[in-house]
Every structure is written in structure tokens, then in C-alpha cells.
Regions:
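Segments of small-molecule ligand-sensing domains
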Residues: 96-108, 112-172
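Short beta->alpha linker loops
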Residues: 3, 27-30, 55, 109-113
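Structural signal for conserved beta-strand scaffold positions within catalytic alpha/beta enzyme cores
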Residues: 52, 73, 164, 172-174
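Flexible, glycine-rich phosphate/dinucleotide-binding loops
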Residues: 5-6, 57-59, 80, 169-171
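Residue-level signal for nonpolar/aromatic packing positions in well-ordered secondary structure
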Residues: 23, 35, 71, 93, ...
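Extracellular/periplasmic Venus flytrap/periplasmic-binding protein
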Residues: 1-41, 80-84
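Extracytoplasmic/secreted proteins, especially bacterial periplasmic and envelope-associated proteins
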Residues: 7-10, 34, 55, 84, ...
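Extracellular/periplasmic periplasmic-binding protein-like sensory domains
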Residues: 39-112
Length: 176
């Protein structure tokens, strides 16, 4: 469907008419928020689950707790991730930025992780991007709240997690 639709009634009517058991969402930002709000208002969460790979914590807040019934998300990071690395990351984040810090999400976490990965490359003397793609050494260790690892030889071992929305937060239900 096109982006920036204000009225999702036609799409929601189709979902209801065909008796969909599940809806795969490929919307981001305001489009994801608007669609999920309308989905929730129409009570479609009682009959169809939703799966997205692009909803993060700030969008979840904007969707509204009352509109998250049976909303599942697959992502490489959730603030609710209960790994030792993420607990330490969140502690450092809140110690630095305080109680009013912006909500942690995959965008902020991946930026932080990217900086640490780049620092690891520089520590190995790899200062030019042309050197990076030819790097065939052993795995590169770097700080990762989601426990990602660069395995060497162009292999990135980044995990993917599944979570379910519970009101304004995600509950991680497993690693895929």
C-alpha cells in the first residue's frame, strides 16, 4: 500500500473481510504508528496478530498501549533484552544521561555499537574503508549490547530476537 495514508479503513476492511489470522507489516515511522492505531481501534488484534521487523520502542509509545494487542516484532535489539551486555549498556546510558534520557531503541543502540566496531577496526590499524573489506583476520571483538560478533572473513554474527508488545514495552520471547 502507498505511504502516508491517513485513512486505513479500506485496508482494515480487507483484513476483516478475508479473516486474516496474521498481518505482516512493512511500514515505518508515522505510517506504522497510524496503521497500528487504526488496527487497534477497530479491535482487529483480537482476531489477527501482527508481525513487524521495523517497530522500535518510540513507535510503540506512539502507537499507544491500547493498540498493541498481539503485536510481535523481530529485531536485532530491544531495550528489554536481558543479556548481561545490555544490562551494562543500559546502566552506562542512564548513568550518563539521567532519568530523563531518551528511550533506548535499536537506532540508538546500533549507532553506539557502530562506534565501538569502528574503534576496534582503528585499533587494528585499519583506517581506510578499502582495507576493511579485505580484512581476513580472526574475529573482531567489540562492545555490543545485543551480543553481536564480527566473525572475520566478512561474517557478521548478529542475533535476531522476537518480542511481543505488552502495553508500552516489549517483552523479548526468544532469540531466532
Amino acid at each position: 500500500m502507498p505511504l502516508q495514508i491517513i485513512d486505513y479503513s479500506e485496508q482494515l476492511a480487507t483484513i476483516r473481510r478475508v479473516g486474516a489470522d496474521a498481518v505482516l507489516l512493512s511500514l515505518v515511522g508515522e505510517d506504522a504508528v497510524a496503521f497500528n492505531r487504526a488496527f487497534g481501534v477497530q479491535g482487529l488484534g483480537r482476531s489477527a496478530l501482527r508481525l513487524s521487523c521495523a517497530i522500535e520502542e518510540n513507535e510503540l509509545l506512539a502507537i499507544g498501549a491500547q493498540n498493541t494487542e498481539r503485536l510481535y516484532v523481530a529485531s536485532s535489539y530491544f531495550a528489554a533484552l536481558a543479556t548481561d551486555a545490555n544490562i551494562a549498556f543500559k546502566e552506562r546510558y542512564h548513568n550518563h544521561f539521567g532519568d530523563r534520557a531518551p528511550t533506548l531503541n535499536s537506532l540508538g543502540q546500533s549507532t553506539n555499537e557502530g562506534v565501538h566496531f569502528l574503534a576496534s577496526l582503528f585499533e587494528r590499524g585499519l583506517f581506510e574503508p578499502s582495507q576493511w573489506k579485505h580484512e581476513r583476520r580472526e574475529p573482531i571483538a567489540y562492545r555490543s549490547a545485543r551480543e553481536a560478533v564480527y566473525g572475520g572473513d566478512g561474517i557478521n554474527l548478529a542475533p535476531t530476537y522476537m518480542a511481543v508488545a505488552e502495553g508500552h514495552v516489549f517483552r523479548v520471547i526468544g532469540r531466532l
